[in-house]
């Protein structure tokens, strides 16, 4: 295990230097995400944490050089600073809320809408008439067909999980 950034990279470097047989190493560093939530993505705290992470990662790549290792870095989500004013609250849009079978699902930056049978046109008209400047409205089948969630064949249950429509906020907006 590890508790500090340096310890995390030391553990990974130790595995790379050990000459052990092929293995999969997963490491997660939550500090950048935590600081972004607490201070905002443009804060000095986030910039300093990112610089430290970047420098430690560069040192790891130096260690990995020549080790026949594949290093992949990924993120589980992006960052956005937003405000209360940028939030679309369904309580402010009862004409939209009444078309929904369930509350919006998914996440604030990609909401899934389950629309009551027979209310699809009202839902579409309401979103286009009142929120078009703040959200993209996409039919769920188009999200899948256009590959928004990745290539390949979608799991059979995915279509049901997306609801009928996907709402993707523009700019700093969240739902």
Give the ranges of each region predicted by the language model.
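Feature captures the catalytic ectodomains and active-site-proximal regions of enzymes
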Residues: 1-175
């Amino acid at each position: 295990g590890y508790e500090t950034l340096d310890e995390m990279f030391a553990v990974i470097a130790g595995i790379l230097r050990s000459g052990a047989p092929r293995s999969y190493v997963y490491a997660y560093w939550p500090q950048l995400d935590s600081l972004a939530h607490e201070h905002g993505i443009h804060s000095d705290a986030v910039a300093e944490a990112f610089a430290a992470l970047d420098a430690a990662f560069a040192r790891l790549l130096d260690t990995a050089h020549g080790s026949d290792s594949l290093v992949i870095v990924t993120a589980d989500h992006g960052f956005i600073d937003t405000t209360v004013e940028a939030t679309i609250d369904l309580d402010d849009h009862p004409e939209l809320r009444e078309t929904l079978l369930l509350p919006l699902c998914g996440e604030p930056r990609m909401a899934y809408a389950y629309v009551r049978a027979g209310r699809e046109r009202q839902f579409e008209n309401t979103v286009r008439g009142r929120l078009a400047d703040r959200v993209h409205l996409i039919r769920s089948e188009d999200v899948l067909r256009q590959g928004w969630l990745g290539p390949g064949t979608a799991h059979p249950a995915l279509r049901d999980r997306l609801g009928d429509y996907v709402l993707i906020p523009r700019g700093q907006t969240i739902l």
